[in-house]
Amino acid sequence: MNAARTYSLGILAGGQGARWGGRDKGLVAYQGRPLVAGITLPRPQHAGEILICCRSHPYFYQHFADRVLCESVTNQGPCAGITALMSAAIYPTLMILPVDLIGAPEQVITTLESEWQEDDTAIFLTDTEGRHSPCLRLHVDTLADCEAFFDGGGRKITGLLDKVGARPIPVDAAWLKDADLPASISP
């Protein structure tokens, strides 16, 4: 692997699954396999490591990751998971994806790989109307800013993206579709 292009891939799987009746979305079957497999299989070529931040079922997730970790404070939203993943990453940049990304995971990964520029601190994918999913890439040097944001009560990804000076990358809205509701994966 080209060391300059290698990154840590972090998957956010710590949600409460409230709209799924408390189910862990990463374990939900979609197209014959668990949602987490849609991101990790096949393994992205430039992912030097795969990290999964989950709220439960680490024994299951260990089959899809190099390391599995939990948020230090549970049920605090995706910023807690992002901070935990950044703390564990061993490569200079960390790509973050939600476990329930079903739109176009391969295109999302390729775009976050190809759009990254040497002077970026963070980039995130957004649709043409400004809506986003937690599909982003951050330099690990932003960890202190992420921790300060979270420790100061910040819970919204948009606030975190502002704090680290993230650059938006517009993509087709269909790419960012996730399995927010059971109906989103129904035939």
Residue ranges and their predicted role:
Residues 186-187:
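Long, highly charged low-complexity segments
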